[in-house]
């Protein structure tokens, strides 16, 4: 898992299966996670978030709050308040996915640099999620594990907010004060495309549908294009005509390479019979035969490759990208910089940002896919029109869910199920959208993690590890147990994933609390905060990875700006957990 060869969900599920076969755990232990109330709640809340997203509610509220301030710090502060408030009551991944194009458009309209807002956007979503028990999936996983051990344990809706709210306030102040000093202005991929149009190149193949086969370039209307020029023509036999004269005859199978601005590119891609091949240097070619439907309804997509994508460590050519996704790669950025050379030879890595020319259904198919950390329309400048009735209905139903859950009238899974049913019968959400929103990776991680956690208990491994941690942190006195769990969980989250970190660290936190003679709540809340407070790497938390491309960030940008915030989080979390949640038992 640490080396990234196999995903955390696969590792934990395989480990749980082996433990079951060896007789170390029972079948009920191996599958306890799938039947746990909190884990069912995660799946339901993900589907509810999809309903809020499809209705436009997630765009409506932040767009209203952001305003039109020309002062950067005002925009950052307003964004922090808006995003943290919404993230407190719903999963932060779909929220950030919706907010990225909203913030990009807002920055463009108000002359702000996106790199000063994208990382703060992720941090605001993370911090806001720490204010309630339903704010992040890791909170719900930890609650599920704790209540499985002690069904009488009460974890009120906003109790974790005793830590999360001060953290959120401190995070907002930190962003406003230190982003001008520590957060560099970076050129994003889309800014580079627009600012340097001569660098933007696309190649198309002439197929039988092109209406001007056998005619000259000039008579075909490809000579005096606005913001665009025909830089190269290559025949099927490999003969190349650089800067072809206007009298050159166009033949079926010709490869035409254009250079220019994005508006010109969109015009060329809209012509039936000109099928895109690739974009890069003039000699670059994916060396594959392309065929497809007319491109008039195709869109430009900005996408970030997830760490678990099946195309990771494969070249674009070997991944059969076009046939797999129905899309063509036009540009690839890594660590904030464009990868030059032939696109077909680029080895894909998790976190790469791609500009794609894709079919109109690409976003619908892959918006919630684990193959992509982010997929958004690259050139959407205005919010799509939404049905006002569906928007306010989705908000009203969701607010009712939050009120009922905060009053502890019904279990979260029950209120979430009622909310989801209301979304379905009112048409806010469809069954297919529900299926697409189910977080299979999280559920597999939890399903396997519950079994591994049980094995750590019955074998005594958790007890021994807890004793070792107590010895290492004994110099901190009463703060030792909480500091041990917070530090260990934060480290494990950076190496694995937050879901895996919670399931592996929970039995250690429980045994550590018993050995130290303190309440479970202190180490438990430290576990929740530690699993979600990875600010220093783009790969430690999903939303960090999502904003890395749109912000044009390099890896060390997260370390420079996020590591101090990581220490701030520790300095706030540990004392509060000790002073408020740890009376001696």
Swiss-Prot record:
One GO biological process term: potassium ion transport
PROSITE patterns named in the record: NA_SULFATE, RCK_C
Topological category with respect to the lipid bilayer: Multi-pass membrane protein
InterPro entries linked to this entry: Cit_transptr-like_dom, DASS-Related_Transporters, Na/sul_symport_CS, RCK_C, RCK_C_sf
Transmembrane domains' residue ranges: 5-25, 30-50, 83-103, 117-137, 162-182, 389-409, 411-431, 442-462, 482-502, 561-581
A GO cellular component annotation in the UniProt record: membrane
GO molecular function: monoatomic cation transmembrane transporter activity
Residue ranges annotated for the RCK C-terminal domain, each copy included: 189-274, 288-372
Keyword entries, A-Z: Membrane, Repeat, Transmembrane, Transmembrane helix, Transport
Pfam families documented for this protein: CitMHS, TrkA_C
Cell compartments where the protein resides: Membrane
Domain of life assignment: Eukaryota
Stated family: Belongs to the CitM (TC 2.A.11) transporter family.
Function, as annotated: Not known; mutations in SAC1 produces cells that cannot synthesize arylsulfatase and cannot take up sulfate as rapidly as wild-type cells. SAC1 is necessary for cells to survive sulfur deprivation.
Name this polypeptide is given: Putative sulfur deprivation response regulator
Taxonomic source organism: Chlamydomonas reinhardtii
